[in-house]
């Protein structure tokens, strides 16, 4: 892509496509780094304020004991990670946490439960949590595993804004990471959520042992859905002792991570791209390159689901150095304030959203 093509991009309106080929996606991912970043940043500015980042806070409302066997996750009952299983939290405690998150600048509250799927008896307290968060003027996001049509409709009726359900990696590599469910199961749940009218938060994890082509294919799967996920979390694996993948995980090259962010931004120009789990292992310079490449959302707070996060004071300092301001929430009545999961997916001992 030459400089004339790039210059013409600046004035263009982003086109939402759902027909990306492997070759097209790979060609963008492999552009010279400066051209890739310029293209991503240009497309980013067509839909977003380049100096604004949306802030989310994540809470684990039900920890551990999960029946799934996701190879990266500390919350799986299949792995010996010394993480005790807990019962579902009291909705009142969850709502107290949401208030504190709102006061710290979060406009969205993400709640993760380590389940394969919720039981019907779990729905009443979960719905109470959603309604309580919404009453604070915040957006509510949940990640609870696979849903039935009826459960998705109940969540929609309660006012749930987002549902997180990550595809983690490419379809080809998926069975190397998770064996207790299929890639198709993930896509089925995404369709169930979208059919209920809930926005989708769906991304993946880098550092599972995948190849760069798997990262490209993961994003191509999302970009070719009938509707792009409104939120796309990109997580860096935090290897957790006791999980199978911790033994084989290899660090991701920082520039490869930034390329993945840029490709997500270019292929899904209207979606929020979240720099999710793994920021504690990233330098300020790497995070700033991610923002330059089109990331415009983070998790704030000291912890995600079961893994560490930089913390509000460190994030405030970084934002100040970069001239970034947190996105304001949408005005709501009585308020001006607006998921391993940790790989924001409840199955991620990391963070999901």
Swiss-Prot record:
Binding site for [4Fe-4S] cluster: 66, 70, 73
Record flagged with keyword Nuclease: no
Pathway: Cofactor biosynthesis; biotin biosynthesis; biotin from 7,8-diaminononanoate: step 2/2
Domain Radical SAM core positions: 51-270
Example of a GO MF term: iron ion binding
Record protein name field: Biotin synthase
Its job: Catalyzes the conversion of dethiobiotin (DTB) to biotin by the insertion of a sulfur atom into dethiobiotin via a radical-based mechanism.
SUPFAM superfamilies: Radical SAM enzymes
Region (Disordered): 330-353
